[in-house]
Amino acid sequence: MTLLEKGHHPRFHIGESLLPMNMPILQRLGVLEQVRAIGVLKLGADFPNDSGGYNTFRFAQALGAQSEYAFQVPRADFDRVLFAHARGAGADLREGIKVESVQLDGAQPLVQARDADGLRQFRPRYLIDASGRDTFLGNTLKLKRANPRHQSAALFSHFRGVARRPGEDAGNISIYRHAHGWMWLIPLPDDVMSVGAVCDPEYMKTRQGDSEAFLLRTLALNPDVAARMQGAQRIAPVHATGNYAYECTRMSGPRWLMLGDAYAFVDPMFSSGVYLAMHSAERGAAMVDAALRDPASEARLQRGLERHLRRGLNEFKWFIYRFTSPTMRELFAQPRNVLQVEQAVVAMLAGDVFDNRAVLRRLRVFRAIYAMSALAMLPRAWRAWRHRRRQAREQFHGDTLHGDKS
């Protein structure tokens, strides 16, 4: 296996909050203890409630919990652990080499890439696009489409001196809402806090001048976040990224496959990105191995993989599309475990959205509860739906990470 990486490790990357469903994958890879050593223990997710406190959804409460914890990780350190492990397992890892073109019409893919010594060619038996939000094949093959139902943009950075939640909740991710979207606080080692605000593109267009000032003004929109940020010091650049939501019209073709964000991304809400990438990579690797052993089965295997991954992605999408709605706000602020529905929602927050039929059945019950609650507050729900539809048509330009590729 040869991996072509255009950058060099360590490097900055978003995606610092793992899910409990990452833990079995890390265990199978043999790196769980290494990740434990660099991470902060995460036992749940905190959402403010109407009484001024928090509703903490603890992963131990998840229906059929496969892991009761996860970790918050400095992403550069996490990637370094995985990169070193892959090299130790025999992978040919090349850094500082940028893929410039691919040809997929021959018996084997042809990849042309450039490093410091010039142009190089590769003819892999199978081509896997794991380029993340750069979406190399999606752009090359013109398969990438903006999500017509959801768009958002974000500003984020790292700070020291941000107040943490007390006791065993100190490592939890905290999710707050504001008038134009939502915010995250992710505790990292060494008193570092990853802080970000995900916003409607319409609101992001009001940004003028200094990005740090705009981020701080946005964070001040939520009094609880402002209180936790008192006395905090920024220790990293403020980054902006936008046009989050996209999906490619297909995931695969003869001898090629897209994985993770290279195929689709919706929103950083619920911290699903790293888990979806790793789950798709594990399933994708098994699919490629089977297809190379039996080429006649490739198309069938690819269809099965795409159905499987779309199913889980669609579960996250349903919640993400509605999270900032007044209906979802009330349901999360006043959770009730009728028919184990709350436990199923916690399982979703843990990433268990693919194969657990008990969870999936109860999430359908939650959808029915949501629909009835929305009818009970129909004018507010209707206004929120119209606002979301308007934002889905907006585009944000000013990405500091991906050059506004969309």
What is each PLM-predicted segment?
Residues R11-G52:
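N-terminal FAD cofactor-binding segment of flavoenzymes
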Residues I38, Y203-M287, R293, A299-G304:
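FAD/FMN-dependent oxidoreductases across multiple families
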Residues L3-L4, L127, L259, F265:
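Generic enzyme active-site microenvironment
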Residues Y54-V73, L110, V198-E202:
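Helix-loop-beta segment of a Rossmann-like dinucleotide-binding subdomain
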Residues A286-S406:
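C-terminal helical "tail/cap" subdomain of flavin- and related membrane-associated enzymes
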Residues H85-M229:
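Predominantly flavin-linked oxidoreductase catalytic cores and closely associated redox partners
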